């Protein structure tokens, strides 16, 4: 329905008055509650689709052209101030065609950071300065001397919808986080909320953290977010969110992570490729409320696959990149071996719900085809506030992301099952073999003759033909070999396995889904 111009003016006059009241207070009083008031106001009104003001030369450009538009590093925000952080901005272009408002919060005021084309070097992109002078930014990035005290490196990028990416020391960008996911993988189609406005607190010279506030908006939800960014060897952000639904949603994804898995050791490439593995993440890790650790290796299935792990008050979950030897990837350009894992640690009790994993078929590495989030069993009524707090850590230290007394899966290898004959020649027997290597800080200290055994199971669509365990001296762990026979290849097959020593559980649970048509 088209709104009359005067109605729109009156509505935004009310928002302007609200903003004036908010900004009248000093910076130390600015909080997530100020942003929440705006989110509540938006939730009480009908959604207005943001309008693009982008000239066609920018809207229709290809990725290579967009890459030519580079921020002028000499004009980084706070460049002339003694702060540990600097800001740079993204220009609009391609599908980044809607401006976001970016504000600076100081000790005495809140003011908008104005767009100017002078911030950017446009390369060979022809443009009229008069048509771009009031465009606004597509997003921003944060810089910090995380690798060297004399050089500022990018540590955070906020660009597109509610996506953001972070990296710690020695890491390169890989998977992304999001503010909120709505109706992911449902037949009705996914809704992508977007951060429409940011408030960034100017850091003091001695600050080791940066505080960012964000206002989220979408047709059926609004939200207020507070991010406390803490860069180090790993980078950590404390997230606080206040979410308000405008209308009913089918599925609400809290603390969503988005990644890519094309092929790997458990799901080899269908074509010959010099890279043995190609992925930003290779598994979903879950620390359930009952203490169980679960590892689900990722797949690139031929059909959409949705897995749900019921867990009340989860202790943590994340999409991890396990196994960082360069030889596993052999990619000098994209350095998948340096891409971080992302781990969510909930704060407080989230209640009853599930960690959900969505695997989407893809033919190339440019498509993010993996999504993971926690979704509550019961959704709130429209307008009612729901709160979630959690810590998000991006790390290359997989030992740090797992309990020291619980062994974890280092790798899952898949092979054609076979039997060694009396003449020592291996003969395929129609089975599929999985070789799973377990290791861990406590497991490495176990004597080699420890009687480690496996507890393994498979659903009604398969039979376990072999389950054997042997010590692996290379990793100071144990290797489990499973050979399984699938009854109907057009159906999904579920398997589970863990290592034990008598009644003592030694490892996490390997929870594998063999996709249909494999």
UniProtKB/Swiss-Prot annotation:
Keywords: Periplasm, Signal. Transmembrane segments: none annotated. One of its GO terms (biological process) is beta-glucan biosynthetic process. Pathway: Glycan metabolism; osmoregulated periplasmic glucan (OPG) biosynthesis. Residues 1-29 form the signal peptide. One of its GO terms (molecular function) is catalytic activity. One of its GO terms (cellular component) is outer membrane-bounded periplasmic space. Pfam families: MdoG (PF04349). It is found in: Periplasm. Its main location: periplasm. The keyword Transcription does not apply. Involved in the biosynthesis of osmoregulated periplasmic glucans (OPGs). Belongs to the OpgD/OpgG family. HAMAP family: MdoG_OpgG (MF_01069). This is Glucans biosynthesis protein G.
């Amino acid at each position: 329905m088209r709104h009359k111009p005067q109605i729109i003016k009156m509505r935004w006059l009310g928002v302007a008055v609200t903003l004036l009241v908010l900004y009248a207070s000093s910076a130390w009083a600015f909080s997530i509650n100020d942003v929440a008031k705006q989110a509540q106001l938006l939730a009480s009104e009908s959604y207005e689709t943001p309008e693009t003001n982008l000239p066609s030369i920018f809207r229709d450009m290809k990725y290579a052209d967009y890459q030519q538009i580079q921020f002028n590093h000499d004009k980084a925000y706070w460049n002339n101030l003694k702060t540990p952080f600097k800001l740079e901005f993204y220009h609009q272009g391609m599908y980044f065609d809607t401006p976001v408002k970016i504000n600076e919060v100081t000790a005495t005021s809140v003011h908008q950071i104005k767009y100017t084309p002078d911030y950017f070097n446009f390369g060979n992109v022809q443009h009229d300065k008069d048509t771009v002078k009031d465009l606004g930014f597509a997003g921003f990035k944060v810089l910090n001397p995380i690798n060297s005290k004399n050089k500022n490196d990018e540590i955070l990028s906020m660009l597109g919808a509610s996506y953001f990416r972070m990296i710690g020391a020695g890491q390169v960008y890989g998977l992304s986080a999001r503010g909120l996911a709505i109706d992911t993988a449902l037949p009705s189609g996914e809704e992508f909320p977007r951060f429409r406005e940011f408030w960034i607190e100017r850091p003091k010279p001695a600050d080791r953290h940066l505080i960012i506030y964000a206002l989220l908006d979408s047709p059926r939800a609004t939200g207020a977010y507070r991010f406390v960014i803490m860069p180090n060897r790993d980078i950590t952000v404390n997230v606080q969110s206040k979410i308000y639904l405008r209308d009913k949603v089918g599925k609400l994804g809290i603390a969503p992570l988005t990644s890519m898995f094309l092929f790997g050791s458990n799901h080899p490439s269908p074509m010959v490729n010099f890279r043995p593995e190609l992925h930003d993440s290779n598994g979903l890790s879950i620390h359930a409320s009952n203490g169980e650790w679960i590892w689900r290796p990722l797949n690139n299935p031929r059909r959409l696959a949705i897995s749900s792990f019921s867990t009340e008050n989860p202790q943590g979950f994340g999409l991890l990149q396990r196994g960082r030897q360069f030889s596993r990837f052999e990619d000098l350009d994209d350095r998948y071996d340096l891409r971080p894992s992302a781990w969510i640690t909930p704060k407080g009790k989230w209640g009853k719900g599930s960690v959900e994993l969505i695997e989407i078929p893809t033919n190339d590495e440019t498509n993010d085809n993996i999504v993971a989030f926690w979704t509550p069993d019961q959704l709130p009524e429209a307008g009612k506030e729901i709160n979630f707090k959690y810590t998000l850590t991006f790390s290359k230290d997989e030992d740090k992301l797992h309990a020291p007394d619980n062994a974890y899966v280092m790798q899952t290898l898949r092979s054609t099952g076979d039997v060694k004959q009396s003449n020592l020649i291996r003969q395929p027997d129609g089975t599929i073999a999985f070789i799973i290597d377990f290791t861990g800080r406590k497991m490495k200290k176990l004597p080699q003759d420890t009687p480690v055994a496996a507890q393994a199971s498979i659903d009604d669509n398969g039979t376990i033909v072999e389950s054997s365990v042997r010590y692996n001296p290379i990793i100071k762990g144990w290797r489990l070999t499973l050979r399984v026979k699938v009854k109907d290849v057009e159906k999904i097959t579920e398997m589970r396995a863990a290592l034990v020593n008598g009644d003592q559980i030694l490892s996490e649970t390997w929870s594998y889904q063999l996709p249909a048509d494999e």
